[in-house]
Amino acid sequence: MRLENSELRAFRAVIEEGGFKRAAEALHISQSAVSQAVAGLEFKLEAPLVQRGKDLRLTEVGKRLFEHAVDV
C-alpha cells in the first residue's frame, strides 16, 4: 500500500483549513479532488479518517495519520 504525497497534502489541508472547501481553495484544486484524495486514503487504510458532519473531527486513525502527514 502506497500513500501518495498528494493525498496526504489534501488530508492535511482539510484538517488545517477546517473543511474540504477551504482545503480545495488553499490547494488551488477542486473540492471533488480533495474529497477523492481523502476517500483514497480511507480506502487504502480501510478506516475512516474524519467524521463528517456539522463539525469535522478526526478519528483515531485520522489523528495518527495527521501526525505523519505533517512531515509531508
Predicted segment positions?
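C-terminal effector-binding regulatory domain of bacterial HTH transcription factors
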Residues: M1
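A short LG(V/I)-centered, amphipathic sequence patch enriched
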Residues: E42-L58
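Residues in the recognition helix of alpha-helical DNA-binding motifs
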Residues: A37
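Alpha-helical linker/hinge and terminal dimerization helices associated
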Residues: K44-L45, L65-V72
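Short alpha-helical "packing" element that flanks the helix-turn-helix/winged-helix DNA-binding module
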Residues: A10-V14, L65
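The N-cap/first-turn positions of alpha helices
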Residues: E4-E7, Q31, G62, A69
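Short helix-boundary/capping micro-motifs
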Residues: A13-H28
